[in-house]
């Protein structure tokens, strides 16, 4: 990055981090596990398998996304598409009463959420000088918590 930091870009960075925290804390850590076990009478293992399956897919694919991000410099479009898919899949979980459909939607939502982070994190050097990367990253963390 050269010149003055773009305040709008920094604010966008921080707000995205805020949304990440909401998704991670509420959907992944708290509510979806309860949705599976309490609302639908599923076993804990189903939640664990869905989470593990989505993370396995992430582990296989995000190195490729990282290469694409680094070599092409295209970050905004993949970030936007993955975020939109994650939001839609998350919203649809609340619209279904079928456990297996909800588990499938959760896998999609979490996969896209985790994959989007590759593009989101790679944008930080574009909005921050090397000397203030930590501070700007901290804005996002502090807003999220």
Model-assigned labels for residue ranges:
Residues 2-55, 99:
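Helix-loop boundary and gating motifs at the non-cytosolic
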Residues 69-84:
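Cytoplasmic membrane-interface "Motif A"-like loop-to-helix N-cap segments
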Residues 44-45, 128-141:
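Loop-to-transmembrane helix entry/capping segments in MFS-fold secondary transporters
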Residues 89-90, 97-119:
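Hydrophobic core of transmembrane alpha-helices in multi-pass small-molecule transporters
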Residues 55-63:
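Residue-level signature of mid-helix packing/kink "hotspots" within the transmembrane helices
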